Amino acid sequence: MRDSSSPARPSLTQLPAWQALKSHFETMRDRHLRDLFAADPRRGERLVAEGAGVYLDYSKNRITDETLRLLLQLAREAGVEARRDAMFAGERINLTENRAVLHSALRAPRGAAVTVDGTNVVQEVQEVLDRMSAFADRVRAGTWLGATGKPIRNIVNIGIGGSDLGPVMAYEALKFYADRRLTLRFVSNVDGTDLVEKTRDLDPAETLFIVSSKTFTTLETMANAQSARAWLLAGLENVPDENAAIARPIISRHFVAVSTNAAEVERFGIDTANMFGFWDWVGGRYSVDSAIGLSLMIAIGPNGFRDFLAGFHAMDEHFRSAPLEQNLPVLLGVLGVWYRNFFGAQTYAVLPYDQYLAYFPTYLQQLDMESNGKHVTLDGQPVDYDTGPVVWGQPGTNGQHAFYQLIHQGTTLIPCDFLGFCQTLNPLPTPGGPSHHDLLMANMFAQTEALAFGKSLEQVQAEGVAADLAPHRVFEGNRPTNTLLLDRLTPRTLGTLIALYEHKVFVQGAIWNINSFDQWGVELGKVLASKIVPELEAPGEPELKHDSSTNALIRRYRARRR
């Protein structure tokens, strides 16, 4: 399903660079990082790149200069640069939904111009940001009052997918900068436990709900929103939820919406003056820097939020202008293709050495897997190569005592990104010993060194280890890693990191010739669930027409749920 004005692209596997990489891989398959570093004492100084405040050391990858040359040639032959320029120009590169892809416009500075269908969307974005700022300032100042006259002290964001993962990740990452007088909670799961536990200790009179749903019809989000409305009304005035005349002015003080569906927002009882919109050219997983980030703006303030946007924009500009050889998203993207398509790596770990980034791997999981988990090309043809990997991770050093064993000595190749900061936000000395941050970063540097170089049998034997134990103490090494170093975790650097990975995912999707901006795989389960709900709720035994397994599961659930 391609733009009829563009010629069909040759199959990825037929591109000259791909064919050259296949041959080159045979010479690289067994080359060890020990040998690559021994042959080039300056390798760790040469194979680095820097942009927008991010320092990338990619020297511990199983590549040579020739590998990198061929990978960048593949990016060029696959049209990465042209597709990048088309995205920034507002062309409708999301072909299956006939939409532009312009999350970059969300962080364009005031006065910039990005036109979609004759409209400068940057001006619209700035207008929404100004409204968000005014609202956030009132909540933070205590002048936005609930229905009983109390100031708001609790903010509960209700959303799912991109309407939840982005805000909760960013809030946790920037909690150091948050107004601690405010309590922020995030509800996403339709499991009632999520809402019950998140509201259990809150005073309804001081609680504001942000309902984030573009259509205001998302099943899980609206179920949670309706239950939250009932909780609020019961806790304030014991007003029946259906008594709209009494309930509406109460709801309007305790609910705001991030949506584009004014009719549904008003039907719910929210004043549309308190509705903050966004656009169909913003995908959910790319929306944390839109009105979806309202909870974050309330937490860190409008100035902090604009710093957050400035970080995104800095990486956007780097991605647009840096030569491919020094372009951070391109380098990360092509290295990922190298391991996914030539080494057959099925998974990829993101390992932030900062506790504030605990939710960052989960956020990237959606960003990457929902974007590039595709099995057909833009033309609708089945791919004959692997696409998106499984993305996962945990903050260091926790992961070292959980799954690093498999990365070091298991039989599965798992490329890793290590993320660290030179300065900590919470300096904490260890009495009589090194600081906590030095301990943390020493572990990060040690892990990348150990993964790269391992420990040979000869080294183990030289330590006097018993012969029967020696094989167990061998580390093969040759496990590839990237290390990303930044000075300090701030709203700006977080925005930069998010944009870096957004564009890395874009680069890989462009090379694989897939649409990174739809998510049809999410839809089928939702459709089937909507058919099963009435069967679960039916007073009598429903006629079930599913497969035998699903029918049996439904019957067992109905029989045992009470």
From Swiss-Prot:
Xref: Pfam families? PGI
Q: Name one GO cellular component term.
A: cytosol
**Pathway the protein contributes to:** Carbohydrate biosynthesis; gluconeogenesis; Carbohydrate degradation; glycolysis; D-glyceraldehyde 3-phosphate and glycerone phosphate from D-glucose: step 2/4
Please name the GO terms that the record assigns under molecular function. Answer: carbohydrate derivative binding; glucose-6-phosphate isomerase activity; monosaccharide binding
Q: Which residues form the active site?
A: E370 (proton donor), H401, K526
Entry-linked InterPro entries: G6P_Isomerase (IPR001672), G6P_Isomerase_C (IPR023096), Phosphoglucose_isomerase_CS (IPR018189), SIS_dom_sf (IPR046348), SIS_PGI_1 (IPR035476), SIS_PGI_2 (IPR035482)
**Listed name of the protein:** Glucose-6-phosphate isomerase
* Native source species: Deinococcus geothermalis (strain DSM 11300 / CIP 105573 / AG-3a)
> Which gene name belongs to this protein?
pgi
